[in-house]
A protein has these predicted regions:
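Repeat-solenoid scaffold signature
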Residues: 89-120, 213-263
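Short glycine/acidic-enriched loop and turn motifs that connect beta-strands
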Residues: 13, 59, 105-108, 175-178, ...
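Residue position within the beta-strands of beta-propeller blades
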Residues: 8, 53, 100-101, 170, ...
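Short loop/turn segments that connect beta-strands within beta-propeller blades
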Residues: 18-21, 64-67, 117-120, 199-201, ...
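Beta-propeller domains
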Residues: 9-31, 186, 202
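Short coil/turn segments that connect the beta-strands within blades of beta-propeller domains
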Residues: 3-5, 48-49, 95-97, 164-166, ...
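Extracytoplasmic beta-rich repeat domains
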Residues: 1, 27-48, 70-90, 107, ...
């Protein structure tokens, strides 16, 4: 909501609704059915007088807040795009960038977090959830196969940002195949994890994997929560993450240090 206008995604449309009268100010629909918003509950992001929305075609679009006119659209999928890649999170706007997650459902692919320039749509950086050869964590996947290329880790929950710390936080999904752990030996980083990334560069600041080698689809099930806490008389910037089985994890969001004992 901004200046009394509600902005929302519904089916294959983005609406601007007058909050006082309920009248439609404008409606925008992509050119093709394949590009429709997914899913309707993901919502939109606002910033710099633009409305940002994710598309089924693994694209992000920016619309003018006042008219709904398309300003830019940019692909955040792989090249060539992997089947099923979608932007399933509401875009987040902060410090001149738009942050989104990309997921392929449970069909594999490579989950990722992408940052785009809010004004132009140019991609600033991409962080792949499953590390590539030579990257930290790649050794947590089988070294004698290419299963990592379809290892999953879809980013399907909206993230959150702390501009003061310069970090953006996302939860990642389960590895793929979901229950076929025998073909993906290892911890399978950075699936089923909390990721803290540098907002400017996309570099990993810290991570915590809530399930190693997940074979239960027990990844994080709710958006991450940032909050302020007092521990031993000292103020702490904290983060809460809840796993699908209801276990709650609490972290110092600056360092990733657990605030409660984890066994």
């Amino acid at each position: 909501v901004k200046a009394g206008v509600l902005y929302l995604a519904a089916g294959a449309n983005v609406f601007a609704i007058d909050g006082r009268t309920g009248e439609t100010v404008w409606r925008w629909q992509p050119d093709s059915a394949e590009a429709g918003m997914v899913p309707s509950w993901q919502g939109v992001g606002l910033g710099e007088d633009l409305v940002f929305v994710g598309l089924r075609s693994a694209q992000v679009a920016a619309l003018r807040q006042d008219t709904g006119e398309l300003v830019w659209v940019e692909s955040v999928g792989s090249v060539p795009q992997q089947a099923g890649g979608q932007v399933t999170t509401a875009p987040i706007h902060a410090v001149g960038k738009v942050f989104v997650g990309v997921a392929n459902g449970d069909s594999g692919g490579q989950g990722r977090v992408v940052a785009l320039d809010a004004a132009t749509g140019d991609i600033a950086w991409t962080f792949f959830v499953v590390p590539r050869p030579g990257e930290f964590g790649h050794d947590t996947w089988p070294q004698d196969s290419d299963v990592w290329q379809v290892g999953g880790g879809g980013v399907w929950l909206v993230g959150t940002v702390d501009p003061d710390l310069g970090m953006v936080y996302f939860a990642t999904g389960n590895p793929v195949p979901m229950f076929g752990g025998e073909i993906r030996a290892g911890d399978n980083l950075f699936t089923a994890s909390v990721l803290a990334l540098d907002m400017d560069t996309g570099d990993r600041r810290w991570h915590y994997q809530v399930v190693r080698h997940d074979i239960w689809d027990a990844d994080i099930a709710t958006p991450l929560l940032l909050y302020e806490a007092e521990i031993d008389g000292e103020p702490r910037k904290a983060l809460a993450a809840m796993r699908a089985d209801g276990l709650l994890f609490l972290f110092d969001r600056e360092t990733g240090t657990p605030l409660t004992q984890i066994e």
